[in-house]
């Protein structure tokens, strides 16, 4: 029923510029917890490497992917109980996300509570640009398979309706865990686990022969499964990396204010190092518990990067930017290593930033390093809190002037500087 359009439109490696209002809420794909998760029966036989990823492809080729289920609109209506309000998981500029149920074998709609739970993203009618962003996501997630990329189960295209069906991520987004009022604070170990998983996802995209630049790496697009394994979602802004002797891709400035690399904002020249910068911002959010942009703060403190950067290379002052909700329960050496890594990722000179594979290696090394016993006297060691393995966890000093409830205010996306196009930001 109209699931595959016969069109010559291509998802091209250099010129498409999807609009900025869609897919800003993939972070809320799974804001409610469910005991049901996507079983192995939904594993998609897509590329585990993008070495031979065929681009550009026609729309017909993309939508005829054998890896995806072509749902009818009626099937998804049944799966979500006619998109009822009590099935709504979240909404944003792009549209709405609903909780749905499908049979694990046939992938047909099933009764609520039976089969497996999925997240159904229903896009608003946004015309050609909205369709292009939707198609870009189908193109990439329909071909790629990796433990740290969210799994796309299928899609629906009928008339003006554009929907995507994903595996359900019961722990929701990293953004919600860090910034939502009342959320339980993440432990140091979980924060590093999330960072490592996200780094694995980006490394997979960057190191492929047919490189993919994610272009919208942020806490809202990092989804978490029941064990806090992180997966990248929302590939609507993804771009094919430079080929041949090219060093960058020239494109209209798109992304999210506070996460976008400064050289990309200024020139429109996109490289994998742009993603590295964005990763540095998210790593900083994990360390500090503060948003990339917070308009409720004053002056330089509105920008997390501007505010935190002076402290990242100073062991004695690093505690000033650490999330007070950690209660000082983090290894000082590990925190300094992570902060130093964030500082490298945020280098204003893109060429001096590390590759994501190098970032991942550092994080893996950090996770495998056991916390030391510090330099305190014997009594201090006895009184020190201990981790699950019995090792002493350094309790870093608190900056009590920051011990107040965080303001959970969604930052507005300020206009970014332009080069020769008017940027669209989320």
Swiss-Prot record:
Belongs to the protein kinase superfamily. Ser/Thr protein kinase family. This is Probable serine/threonine-protein kinase PBL3. InterPro entries: Kinase-like_dom_sf (IPR011009), Plant_Ser_Thr_Prot_Kinase (IPR050823), Prot_kinase_dom (IPR000719), Protein_kinase_ATP_BS (IPR017441), Ser-Thr/Tyr_kinase_cat_dom (IPR001245), Ser/Thr_kinase_AS (IPR008271). Residues 367-394 have a biased composition (Polar residues). The modification Phosphotyrosine is found at residues 166, 264. Residues 7-42 have a biased composition (Low complexity). Its EC number is 2.7.11.1. It comes from the Eukaryota. The modification Phosphoserine is found at residue 250. Residues 83-366 form the Protein kinase domain. It catalyses: L-seryl-[protein] + ATP = O-phospho-L-seryl-[protein] + ADP + H(+); L-threonyl-[protein] + ATP = O-phospho-L-threonyl-[protein] + ADP + H(+). The lineage of its organism: Eukaryota, Viridiplantae, Streptophyta, Embryophyta, Tracheophyta. GO terms for biological process: defense response. A lipid is attached at residue 4 (S-palmitoyl cysteine). Interacts with the Xanthomonas campestris effector XopAC/AvrAC. The gene is PBL3. GO terms for molecular function: ATP binding; protein serine kinase activity; protein serine/threonine kinase activity. It is found in: Cell membrane; Nucleus. A lipid is attached at residue 2 (N-myristoyl glycine). It comes from Arabidopsis thaliana.
């Amino acid at each position: 029923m109209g699931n595959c359009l016969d069109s010559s439109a291509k998802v091209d490696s250099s010129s498409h510029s999807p609009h900025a209002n869609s897919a800003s809420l993939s972070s809320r794909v799974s804001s409610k917890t469910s005991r049901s998760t996507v079983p192995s029966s939904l594993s998609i036989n897509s590329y585990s490497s993008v070495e031979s990823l065929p681009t550009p492809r026609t729309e017909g080729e993309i939508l005829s992917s054998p890896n995806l289920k072509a749902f009818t609109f009626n099937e998804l209506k049944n799966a979500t109980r006619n998109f009822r309000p009590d099935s709504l998981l979240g909404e944003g500029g792009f549209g709405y996300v609903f909780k749905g149920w499908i049979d694990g074998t046939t992938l047909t709609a099933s009764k609520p509570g039976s089969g497996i739970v999925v997240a159904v993203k229903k896009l608003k009618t946004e015309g050609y640009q909205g369709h292009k962003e939707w198609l870009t996501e189908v193109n990439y997630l329909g071909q790629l398979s990796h433990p740290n990329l969210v799994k796309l189960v299928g899609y629906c295209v009928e008339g003006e309706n554009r929907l995507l069906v994903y595996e359900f991520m019961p722990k929701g987004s990293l953004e919600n865990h860090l910034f939502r009022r009342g959320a339980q604070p993440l432990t140091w170990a979980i924060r590093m686990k999330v960072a490592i998983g996200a780094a694995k996802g980006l490394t997979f995209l960057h190191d492929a022969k047919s490189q993919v630049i994610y272009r919208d790496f942020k806490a809202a697009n990092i989804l978490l499964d029941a064990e806090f394994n992180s997966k990248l979602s929302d590939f609507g802004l993804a771009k094919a990396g430079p080929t041949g002797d090219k060093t960058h891709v020239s494109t209209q400035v798109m992304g999210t204010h506070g996460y976008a690399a400064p050289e990309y904002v200024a020139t429109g020249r996109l490289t994998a190092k742009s993603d590295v910068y964005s990763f540095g911002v998210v790593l900083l959010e994990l360390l500090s518990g503060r948003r990339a942009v917070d308009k409720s703060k004053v002056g330089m403190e509105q920008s997390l990067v501007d505010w935190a950067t002076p402290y990242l290379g100073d062991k004695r002052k690093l505690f000033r930017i650490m999330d007070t909700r950690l209660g000082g329960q983090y290894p000082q050496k590990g925190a300094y290593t992570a902060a130093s890594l964030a500082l490298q990722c945020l280098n204003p000179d893109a060429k001096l930033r590390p590759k994501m594979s190098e970032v991942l290696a550092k994080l893996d090394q950090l996770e495998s390093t056991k916390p030391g016993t510090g330099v305190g006297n014997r009594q201090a060691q006895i009184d020190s809190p201990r981790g699950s393995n019995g090792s002493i966890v350094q309790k870093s000093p608190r900056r009590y002037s920051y011990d107040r409830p965080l303001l959970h205010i969604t930052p507005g996306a300020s206009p970014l500087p332009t080069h020769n196009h008017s940027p669209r930001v989320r």
